[in-house]
């Protein structure tokens, strides 16, 4: 860069001064790296979102909206139900669910009950599900009442791989008209769920209690139960 006069130099200095003033209001990178925060479990962040955004939509599933308050209530009820059927610290809960509101609810409910979430791909074969369940020590699994999934889960439950199977209703997750159409035209895709142990419906699980017992979780050491 070539300066032809003192005026050019003064102009550059003026620009640098303006830039420095503008940067004064920004947080230095070194300070950003030293920000302090209080570690909390993941479900506590959900509770904070519920308290802050209660009436706002949290999930839109095929046109059916769930607000934060509703999601919070569903998580609490499901967590309380999980505790009643034996979920506590160290207990593994498998989620063999597609992308539905049930996944969000049961994920946070498991953590809030003190359990550890183990994700299963619903497209896994029966053998793959069994191998993962045994490897992870999963005896409680959450699934959807679609034959595509339940045909595999049901066989494993019959062989004693799962001690509890929590069944979620696809129809109940859909908005009114779609639920009706699903029942009329897609009924053959639904599995027949035995009304006996080890099965329990999501609705029945959530009706056991409304609030879970508090569980002490250290988010710095209890990594699997964040």
What is the predicted function of each stretch?
Residues 51, 87, 217-221:
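Short, flexible hinge/linker loops that cap or flank conserved catalytic cores
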């Amino acid at each position: 860069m070539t300066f032809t006069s003192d005026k050019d130099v003064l102009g550059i200095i003026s620009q640098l001064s303006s830039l420095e003033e503008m940067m004064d209001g920004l947080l230095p990178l070194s300070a950003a790296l030293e920000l302090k925060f209080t570690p909390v479990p993941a479900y506590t962040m959900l509770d904070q979102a519920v308290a802050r955004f209660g009436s706002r939509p949290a999930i839109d599933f095929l046109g059916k909206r769930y607000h934060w308050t509703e999601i919070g209530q569903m998580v609490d009820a499901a967590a309380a139900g999980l505790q009643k059927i034996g979920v506590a610290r160290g207990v593994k809960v498998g989620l063999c669910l597609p992308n539905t509101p049930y996944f969000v609810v049961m994920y946070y409910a498991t953590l809030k009950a003190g359990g550890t979430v183990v994700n299963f791909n619903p497209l896994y074969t029966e053998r793959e599900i069994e191998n993962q369940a045994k490897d992870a020590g999963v005896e409680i699994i959450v699934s959807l009442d679609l034959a595509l999934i339940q045909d595999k889960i049901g066989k494993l439950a019959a062989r004693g791989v799962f001690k509890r199977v929590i069944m979620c209703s696809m129809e109940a997750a859909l908005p009114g008209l779609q639920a009706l159409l699903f029942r009329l035209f897609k009924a053959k895709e639904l599995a027949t769920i035995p009304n006996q142990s080890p099965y329990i419906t999501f609705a029945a699980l959530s009706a056991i209690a409304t609030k879970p017992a508090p569980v002490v979780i250290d988010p710095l050491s209890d990594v699997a139960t964040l």
